[in-house]
C-alpha cells in the first residue's frame, strides 16, 4: 500500500511540475469547493427554484421558449441584477433587435452595458470568447443562437443548402469557450428559439436550434412560456409566465415557477413577494385582506403590490426572510446581504 501511495504522490508531483499547481486535486482539500457564486435572475421565485439563489457563475446557461414568452426580458433582468452588484455585463445582439429604452425600464444601466451587433455567427462567438478571456466581464448574453448565421451561409445564395453548418459552429465554439468560462468565472447566457421536428407522431415535437452541443454544455436550461394574460378590464397589462428548470447541474432540476411580467416594467417582484409570503406564512391572508407582523397592509393583491412599491424597506425585509428560509443556509444569508446592499 505504501508503494502505491508513494507512486501516486510522485505522479502528482510530476503533474504539478509539468502543468502547474492545482492541475490535479483531491475533492476533500480545504477551500476547493467554494460556495456557488450566483447572479440573481430578478425573479425571487426563479432564484429559489434554481436551488442556489440565482444563475451560477462560471457556467453556460440556456434560456429557450416560443416567441414573446419573456426570454430577452429575463436575460435583461439578470443583467440589471449583475450591474446592481457592481458587475460588468455584455449583450451580443445577433438578432439586431435590442431595445435600449425597454432595457432601461427594466433597470439596466444602458450607458454601462457593452453591446455588440456582429455580422456573422463566427464573429459573435469570437467576440464572446475574447470578452470571456479578458476576465473583466461578469455576464454575457447572446441573443440568440438561431441568429448566429455561419459566414458561408451569409456569403452564399438564397436557397443554398448548408446542412449542419450552424450545429458544427456551435459545437466548436462551446468546446473552446467552456474552460475559459470556468477560469474567468463568467456567466454566459444563450437565448434560444424553438423549432418543430417534422414527422414526430409520439413525444414532444419541439426542439431548439443550433444542434445538440448547447444542451450538453449548459449547466442550467430554462424553458419559459407565456401561460396567460394579466388584464384590467379589457386592457392587457402583462403576461402570466411559467419557467421550468429542465436541466440543473448545481441543484435538483424539474422545479417550475410562475410569475407576472408587466409590460414596460418587467418581472413583478411585488406580486412574487405576496404569493411566496402567503405560501410560507410570512404574510397573513384573511379573505381579501393581507397582513404583515399583525398589521393590515392592504385589501386585494393590487393594493398590497402598491403598498410594497411605496414601502421598499418592508418589501426588502420580506424578501430577505424568504431567501434565508428557502435557500441553503449560507447561500441564502449571503444573497440576502447582497440584495440589501444593492438596495
From Swiss-Prot:
Record's keyword annotation contains Phosphoprotein: no
Principal subcellular localization: cytoplasm
Subcellular location: Cytoplasm
SUPFAM superfamilies: P-loop containing nucleoside triphosphate hydrolases, RecA protein, C-terminal domain
Keywords, comma-separated and alphabetical: ATP-binding, Cytoplasm, DNA damage, DNA recombination, DNA repair, DNA-binding, Nucleotide-binding, SOS response
GO BP annotations, alphabetical order: DNA recombination; DNA repair; SOS response
PANTHER family in UniProt: MITOCHONDRIAL DNA REPAIR PROTEIN RECA HOMOLOG-RELATED (PTHR45900:SF1), RECA (PTHR45900)
Family: Belongs to the RecA family.
Role description: Can catalyze the hydrolysis of ATP in the presence of single-stranded DNA, the ATP-dependent uptake of single-stranded DNA by duplex DNA, and the ATP-dependent hybridization of homologous single-stranded DNAs. It interacts with LexA causing its activation and leading to its autocatalytic cleavage.
Annotated protein name in UniProt: Protein RecA
Organism listed in the record: Coxiella burnetii (strain RSA 493 / Nine Mile phase I)
Amino acid at each position: 500500500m505504501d508503494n502505491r501511495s508513494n507512486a501516486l504522490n510522485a505522479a502528482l508531483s510530476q503533474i504539478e511540475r509539468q502543468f502547474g499547481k492545482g492541475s490535479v486535486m483531491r475533492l476533500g482539500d480545504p477551500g476547493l469547493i467554494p460556495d456557488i457564486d450566483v447572479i440573481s435572475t430578478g425573479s425571487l421565485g426563479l432564484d429559489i427554484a434554481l436551488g442556489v439563489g440565482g444563475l451560477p457563475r462560471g457556467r453556460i446557461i440556456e434560456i429557450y421558449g416560443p416567441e414573446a414568452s419573456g426570454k430577452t426580458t429575463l436575460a435583461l433582468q439578470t443583467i440589471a441584477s449583475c450591474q446592481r452588484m457592481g458587475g460588468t455585463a455584455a449583450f451580443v445582439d445577433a438578432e439586431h433587435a435590442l431595445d435600449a429604452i425597454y432595457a432601461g425600464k427594466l433597470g439596466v444601466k444602458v450607458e454601462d452595458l457593452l453591446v455588440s451587433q456582429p455580422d456573422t455567427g463566427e464573429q459573435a462567438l469570437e467576440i464572446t470568447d475574447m470578452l470571456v478571456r479578458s476576465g473583466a466581464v461578469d455576464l454575457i448574453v447572446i441573443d440568440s443562437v438561431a441568429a448566429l448565421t455561419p459566414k458561408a451561409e451569409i456569403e452564399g445564395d438564397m436557397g443554398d443548402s448548408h446542412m449542419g453548418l450552424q450545429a458544427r459552429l456551435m459545437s466548436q465554439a462551446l468546446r473552446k469557450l467552456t474552460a475559459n468560462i470556468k477560469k474567468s468565472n463568467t456567466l454566459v447566457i444563450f437565448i434560444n428559439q424553438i423549432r418543430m421536428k417534422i414527422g414526430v407522431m409520439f413525444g414532444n415535437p419541439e426542439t431548439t436550434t443550433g444542434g445538440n452541443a448547447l444542451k450538453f454544455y449548459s449547466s442550467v436550461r430554462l424553458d419559459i412560456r407565456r401561460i396567460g394574460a394579466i388584464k384590467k378590464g379589457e386592457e392587457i397589462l402583462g403576461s402570466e409566465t411559467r419557467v421550468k428548470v429542465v436541466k440543473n447541474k448545481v441543484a435538483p432540476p424539474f422545479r417550475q415557477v410562475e410569475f407576472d411580467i408587466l409590460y414596460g416594467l418587467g418581472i413583478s417582484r411585488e406580486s412574487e413577494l405576496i404569493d411566496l409570503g402567503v405560501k410560507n406564512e410570512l404574510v397573513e391572508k384573511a379573505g381579501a385582506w393581507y397582513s404583515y407582523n399583525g398589521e393590515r397592509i392592504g385589501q386585494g393583491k393590487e393594493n398590497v403590490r402598491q403598498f410594497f412599491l411605496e414601502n421598499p424597506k418592508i418589501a426588502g425585509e420580506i424578501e430577505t426572510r424568504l431567501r434565508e428560509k428557502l435557500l441553503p443556509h449560507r447561500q441564502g444569508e449571503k444573497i440576502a446581504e447582497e440584495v440589501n446592499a444593492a438596495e
